[in-house]
């Protein structure tokens, strides 16, 4: 398994463990205790880290798709060179656009690697109250029940 997958799995496990610890500390000490607030802060940081890794993995997948598309367009371009000049210029324009998208995706990956949380995450954390967050984590931790078929 490569290191990115290991890091992603580690992050997922860490996030789930932190959620459970936060719920437990909330139940034992209440929402205003120092130890709970410290754990809650640590949990939110691990959630942000895990979300950033998810986004990075998604962007890397898109980048791979763009690379595949570029290779396909190059093959098409080599076939079109012998046929129609108008189609050739259209394919070259498309290839240029794809290269620009690839550069944009590289830029996004670099910004993710800097570890800057997105403004949406900051808004979500400020909009929800602590008891609501704890209740959401409790619900997520409940076992899944298969639907009964009649």
Curated annotation (Swiss-Prot):
It holds the Pfam family DUF848. InterPro entries: DUF848. Residues 111-132 are annotated as: Disordered. Belongs to the herpesviridae UL96 family. This is Gene 35 protein.
């Amino acid at each position: 398994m490569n290191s990115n997958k290991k890091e992603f799995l580690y992050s997922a496990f860490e996030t789930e463990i932190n959620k459970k610890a936060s719920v437990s500390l909330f139940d034992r000490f209440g929402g205003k205790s120092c130890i709970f607030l410290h754990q809650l802060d640590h949990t939110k940081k691990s959630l942000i880290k895990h979300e950033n890794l998810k986004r990075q993995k998604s962007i890397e997948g898109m980048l791979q798709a763009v690379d595949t598309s570029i290779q396909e367009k190059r093959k098409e371009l080599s076939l079109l060179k012998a046929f129609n000049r108008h189609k050739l210029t259209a394919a070259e324009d498309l290839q240029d656009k794809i290269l620009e998208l690839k550069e944009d995706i590289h830029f996004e990956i670099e910004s993710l690697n800097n570890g800057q949380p997105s403004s949406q995450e900051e808004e979500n954390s400020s909009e929800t109250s602590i008891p609501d967050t704890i209740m959401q984590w409790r619900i997520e931790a409940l076992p899944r029940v298969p639907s009964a078929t009649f």
